[in-house]
Structure formats: structure tokens, C-alpha cells
């Protein structure tokens, strides 16, 4: 009895038993009552695994020490070899219990898929997707299925309550499908899409294809159309990277969306300002055309002219020509507009291009816009002996406009008075030979009186070589 080791009692306070057990089994980690209560609560399987881990912990810790960093301290490795098996055996059943619990819970779930949930900005993401795909689809409003891009757009004001009951239409733009709630289009009735899915569907003007999809916006890229769809949701179009402002402007004009600073946001401010300047220049020139240019055109037309040459001077320019020695370049036929604002308008090449396009749209022809020298006043006169005096004028560079409204400008103005059938015949006699006989007037020559008296009535049948003045031998 004395040689057999005493069983360990967790509640015992005998110091001899504590020292004896501590020295006889240094690798065993003893537990207090709190630990034993947890082990008892874990069950029989928990106790068996703990004992197994305690008995074989030395071999496993030795293998683990070989694969670990050998630069550690030996005492730290010894402590790790003592603690690791117990920690592993305590935590492993708990993890296994949670895994088994999750498996049982998943097996008890119904096999039907989780219903779809809507993201805050209106996109629909499936519950079976990964978290990365779900976050991407919720932020972009898109999802990729079967190798093609499908973008889902809906009215965010409807809320998640009406998602399943609201209508969906599929738009095909540049081989890309957009699933859209048509109510976002009807909120903008002045746009093309608003008319298509508003009054157009009511009057059966907008019809889908055989698959029930609508092919719209021909010639517009999917990236541009995706940015334009944001206008129906937020009222702002953000120009995507790699898309030029003229391309976005063309798409907005096609879809009847106003291209304004309040609706367009982009990083290239120079291109945006250029487009806005073109719009402003068009409106401004249409005003100048009606108020300043058209009255001068009417004055030229009333005088019988079919073209007009207008020079734009500033308000400070003074034209003082000498009546005796006027300019010799035909400036007297030019119309003059005194307007500093119009002068500043035509100073830019872009504005002149806009003005030329407006005049073409109004049906005018032979349009020329530029800057030329215009004489204002006489500087001096150079008199040459025996010749005409030379007048020197002061010239200023000012814009000019030249236009025509002549209808027959393509025909030749040459008047041909030669009565010939062909341009290759220059001889009048040869040309007259081709005149029909019924148009000819035959004029027979009348005989003269002195010839009737001299010529005999019966001319002799003799030799015709006889001299008529010779005396007849028979007489």
C-alpha cells in the first residue's frame, strides 16, 4: 500500500501528495475543480479525448518542435510541450461540436434557394453568390450571367417592398442587356426613352422583339448608355473614363437629354467647356442673325442683289473716305455693322465655324467667314508726274461675312448669240447648209437691161471662138 501511488483528489490539500505527484509525473498538467467541472459538463467523449491527448502529447509536441523555429529558447519549448496537448484537447471538441452543429443546422434547412434581396441602389444580388460578387453587384448595379453582361436598374424610390411586384423590361444596347424598371423613364417624359415607355407603349408604338426585349439606342455603346441610365436615377450623368465629351454629347442629343452643366460631370473640363461654348455661340449668333445681319440682307435683296458682303467694325471705328479718291478694291459694295460685341464674337475660329453651320442650316450658299483688311480713312496721296495719283488708306483687320441666296448659281452665265447648231461649227455658210429647205427663202437674180439689148436672140451655131465685134462677112 505504501508503494502504490495515491489517487489524486482535486479537493485535497495534502502537501505531501502534491509534491509526490509533481515530482513523479512532471509532464502531466493537473486541473482544479473548475476544470474538472467543465470536463464533466463536456461529457464522456470529452474526457476520453483529454486523456488521449495527455498520454500522447509528448510525441506530438516533439514532432511539432522539429518543424518549428529552432531559434526559440529550450525552456519555452518545454513549456509549450506541456501545455499544447491540453489546450488542443480542450478546444478541439468544442470546434468539432460547432462544426457538427452547423452541419446539422444546414441539413435541416429547406432545399429551396434563399429569396433575392435588393441592394440599396436598386440592384438585385443572389444569396448564393460570394460576398465579393455581392458587394460588387450591389455597388455597380450589375451581375454577370452566362458570359453576358446584364445590368439591373430600378427606381430606388419604390423601396424594397415593391421590388417583386414592379414591372421589368429588358433593353438591348450594344449586345448588352439592361433590366430596367420602366417607371424611371416615365419620370422624364421629355426624353426619348420616356416617350417610348410612356405614351409610346400606350399607343402601341413601342414594340419588343420576338423575345420580349427592346432594342434601343442604336450606335451608342453600352458604357455610355450605362452612364446615361444614371441620369434617370440621380439626374446626373458622369462621363466614364475613356469616353470623349463629343461622344457623350451625341448620345444625349440622340436620346433627347439636355446637355447642361447641372447634368454632366466629367474630369476633362476643357472639353466640357468647349461643348457648352458651342451651345452658347449658337444661341448668340441666332440672335445676331435676326437683329443685325438679316436687315442688311433684306436691303441687298431689295436692291436686286442676290448676295451680301458684310464687314463687322467696332463701335469706335471711323470710316472717312475721300470722295475724289475712294478705295480701289470695291469696298463701296460692302455693308457695315458697327458692333463691338459681334466683333468679339467673330474673333474666335470656333464661333465662326458655329456661325457657318447655322447659316447653312438656314439655306444660304457660298458662305465665307474670316478676317480681312478694311480701309477706314485716307492717310496720304502720292502724286506721280503724268500718272494717276496713288491714295494710301489706313486698313484695320475686321471680320467679314459673305453669303449668297442665288438659285441658279450652277448654270453658266454665258449668252451665245451665234446661230449655229453645234459649238464645233464656226463657219456660218456650213451652218446654213444644215437649215431645212422649208425655212429657206430662194432669191433669183434679175437680169439687167443692157445685157438683154446686146445678146442676140438666136446665137450663131458656128465657132464660138469668133470675135463678137468682128464684121459679119455675109453682110
From Swiss-Prot:
Residues 167-241 form the BTB domain. Residues 22-31 have a biased composition (Basic residues). Residues 81-94 have a biased composition (Polar residues). It is found in: Nucleus; Cytoplasm. Residues 57-80, 97-107 have a biased composition (Basic and acidic residues). Residues 1-143, 456-475 are annotated as: Disordered. Residues 108-142 have a biased composition (Low complexity). The keyword Nucleus applies. This is BTB/POZ domain-containing protein 10. The lineage of its organism: Eukaryota, Metazoa, Chordata, Craniata, Vertebrata.
Amino acid at each position: 500500500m505504501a508503494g502504490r501511488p495515491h489517487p489524486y483528489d482535486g479537493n485535497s490539500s495534502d502537501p505531501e501528495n502534491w509534491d509526490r505527484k509533481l515530482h513523479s509525473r512532471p509532464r502531466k498538467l493537473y486541473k482544479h475543480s473548475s476544470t474538472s467541472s467543465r470536463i464533466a459538463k463536456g461529457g464522456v467523449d470529452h474526457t476520453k479525448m483529454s486523456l488521449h491527448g495527455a498520454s500522447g502529447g509528448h510525441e506530438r509536441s516533439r514532432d511539432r518542435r522539429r518543424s518549428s523555429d529552432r531559434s526559440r529558447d529550450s525552456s519555452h519549448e518545454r513549456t509549450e510541450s506541456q501545455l499544447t496537448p491540453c489546450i488542443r484537447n480542450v478546444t478541439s471538441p468544442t470546434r468539432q461540436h460547432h462544426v457538427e452543429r452547423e452541419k446539422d443546422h444546414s441539413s435541416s434547412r429547406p432545399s429551396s434557394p434563399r429569396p433575392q434581396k435588393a441592394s440599396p441602389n436598386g440592384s438585385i444580388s443572389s444569396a448564393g453568390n460570394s460576398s465579393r460578387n455581392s458587394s460588387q453587384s450591389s455597388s455597380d448595379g450589375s451581375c454577370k450571367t452566362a458570359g453576358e453582361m446584364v445590368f439591373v436598374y430600378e427606381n430606388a424610390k419604390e423601396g424594397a417592398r415593391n421590388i417583386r411586384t414592379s414591372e421589368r423590361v429588358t433593353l438591348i444596347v450594344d449586345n448588352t442587356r439592361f433590366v430596367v424598371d420602366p417607371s424611371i423613364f416615365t419620370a422624364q417624359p421629355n426624353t426619348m426613352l420616356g416617350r417610348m415607355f410612356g405614351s409610346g407603349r400606350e399607343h402601341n408604338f413601342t414594340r419588343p422583339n420576338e423575345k420580349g426585349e427592346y432594342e434601343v439606342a442604336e450606335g451608342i455603346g453600352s458604357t455610355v448608355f450605362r452612364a446615361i441610365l444614371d441620369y434617370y436615377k440621380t439626374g446626373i450623368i458622369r462621363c466614364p473614363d475613356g469616353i470623349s465629351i463629343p461622344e457623350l454629347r451625341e448620345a444625349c442629343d440622340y436620346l433627347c437629354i439636355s446637355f447642361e452643366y447641372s447634368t454632366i460631370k466629367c474630369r476633362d473640363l476643357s472639353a466640357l467647356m468647349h461643348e457648352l461654348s458651342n451651345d452658347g455661340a449658337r444661341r448668340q449668333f441666332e440672335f445676331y442673325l435676326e437683329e443685325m445681319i438679316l436687315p442688311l440682307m433684306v436691303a441687298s435683296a431689295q436692291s436686286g442683289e442676290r448676295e451680301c458682303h458684310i464687314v463687322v467694325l467696332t463701335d469706335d471705328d471711323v470710316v472717312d473716305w475721300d470722295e475724289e479718291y475712294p478705295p480701289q478694291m470695291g469696298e463701296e459694295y460692302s455693308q457695315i455693322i458697327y458692333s463691338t460685341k459681334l466683333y468679339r464674337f467673330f474673333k474666335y475660329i470656333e464661333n465662326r465655324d458655329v456661325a457657318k453651320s447655322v447659316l447653312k442650316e438656314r439655306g444660304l450658299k457660298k458662305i465665307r467667314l474670316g478676317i480681312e483688311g478694311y480701309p477706314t480713312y485716307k492717310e496720304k496721296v502720292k502724286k506721280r508726274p503724268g500718272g494717276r495719283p496713288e491714295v494710301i488708306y489706313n486698313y484695320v483687320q475686321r471680320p467679314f461675312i459673305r453669303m449668297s441666296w442665288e438659285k441658279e448659281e450652277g448654270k453658266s452665265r454665258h449668252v451665245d448669240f451665234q446661230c449655229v447648231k453645234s459649238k464645233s461649227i464656226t463657219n456660218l455658210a456650213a451652218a446654213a447648209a444644215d437649215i431645212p429647205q422649208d425655212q429657206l427663202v430662194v432669191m433669183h437674180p434679175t437680169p439687167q437691161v443692157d445685157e438683154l439689148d446686146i445678146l442676140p436672140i438666136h446665137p450663131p451655131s458656128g465657132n464660138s471662138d469668133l470675135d463678137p465685134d468682128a464684121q459679119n462677112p455675109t453682110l
